[in-house]
């Protein structure tokens, strides 16, 4: 089965692009940060420098692995689902489920290996740049030399490979279950997890108020609170979407003509599936907006108190921004990937719509309305989560209102989320519209 | 906007005596179209000329690859012929953009497909009124219910397609095709996925649309039983017209079809003489068929 996996990757490399990107990003981030371990282990590194480097390297370790895992799993799930026909064909020609599993895992390993190899170069540059920032801020001694060695390489390879294999197992299990006709489990655990995330998030945000304004870890509680709230909203996103649709569906459909009418009905029926798009969007907005604005508030507070930034503060800022950047990049990748998959999956539906008398423009209007509504829903709940953390932090840290830059930052984050959502769904739809309607309807889907 | 709407409404009532007219319609598929030395193209339609009067029910039959689906798609504006003229209700279908063709079809043409092509997220009533909504026309609830009652689905307005049987879905598709009061309804293998009883109901509904409501129906089928419901059958072989039958019986259609199949398999590229002045057996002169009226 491995030779089949190799052939299938070689014949159609394009469809593995998303998985490759996820692996590349994952391996790159892991190796970049772990090269700090290599550097710290070098000969003649003083204790403070070594400690700073080790702490920074460990920050990304835990959840970085999780992110890589989820990103690869998300792209592979889409990949396997789109090849339902091919997999059904393999089954009917006598492939056992175990053989299909081996094929998908084999493909995943091939693609992940390619991603890791490609990531080595950028990771060396990225690691050097990160190291440079620490050296410039004075946290690391000038006589320390950057090293990119066995720890970076082995951890990058191990984490990415592990994530790729695990994600492939997860994806193929989901797909074969769907093929066997079984419904996805209702997910009581999921509801419990979502509720727990909301409660813990609210608690974490509330805990901010019991802390001292000058405490160095003050930002941690509201930041984690915001992330947890965003996760909770993401879990309940189908229900939230239905709720908003209940309020706004009628006026929207009246306002937007046939396109909006179809969009409203499509979203009502597909609220559960749209969670795959809303989840990364809520996370992206919540995490990015909360961290960026809290950092702005912190900078302002420091400037107002007349203190210059200490090395620790600078370090914290660097790490904050790096972490947000990584989470945002992964969330964006997952958003674009799942949205692309969900839209290209609808070729047949768009064909039917055109045969019923819809012009290509009306199909685009339908998809555009759906994208707009999803963007508004996702960014609204992301903003809610982010705002909870930011307001709590601001009220404890300073007595002033939110600084003006926060609004600009927020708009920027919303714009990125909206652009990713709308460009992906409209661009994908445009591509499917090139197929004549009669042929689009005939496509198995 | 209003002008267009009015014109659409008029087209639904008054009408040209000739519902559909094809003049020398040709269509080739594949690379090298144009007749060069490396011509790999396949002629799907070869100068087909056809005229169907308003209020007729015509079946188009032929062996696989005879071009019957291409004929239907070219006539219905779903595909663009390489050359030739298509006129629906006396108006020429000009090969503009997809949007222009769609707007042309909206008021003149209705479709029924083998795979129903209903939208899964809409209810029966919403699917039926969708063409009106897309065209920006007023939706008359009573009229919708009346049309759905005619096809026997008056009690299924709120159901979704996945809650219906194949026969019921096809009846929704027929209601959707009729609700815009089109000049011509094109049906592409409408009974291809149905059991015999549902097929009979669907064919009776199409027949009723012609006899009672004066619509024009053009149906592509490979089933002689389905074809026997039509007023006349037009046969196609190798992209050319190959005869017709008036008031067809199942046996007569089957026999003619078997004969066509033999000829097509016999290796002859064109079973009927191409030279003008030599009408093929059963074919009106110069591949032109004019039916009754």
Place the predicted regions along the sequence by residue.
Chain A
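Hydrophobic alpha-helical transmembrane segments of multi-pass inner-membrane transport and secretion
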Residues: 14-40, 51-85, 109-118, 122, ...
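Conserved transmembrane alpha-helices of multi-pass membrane proteins
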Residues: 47-63, 137-166, 185-198, 310-322, ...
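Alpha-helical transmembrane segments, especially those used as permease/efflux helices
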Residues: 2, 6, 11-35, 52, ...
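Short cytosolic juxtamembrane segments of multi-pass membrane proteins
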Residues: 3, 176-187, 433-445
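Small-residue-rich transmembrane alpha-helices
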Residues: 28-39, 76, 110-138, 152-174, ...
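Short amphipathic alpha-helical coupling elements at transmembrane boundaries
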Residues: 7-11, 82-92, 246-253, 261-269, ...
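A cross-kingdom feature of multi-pass membrane systems that activates on extracytoplasmic/periplasmic
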Residues: 32, 36-49, 256, 295-316
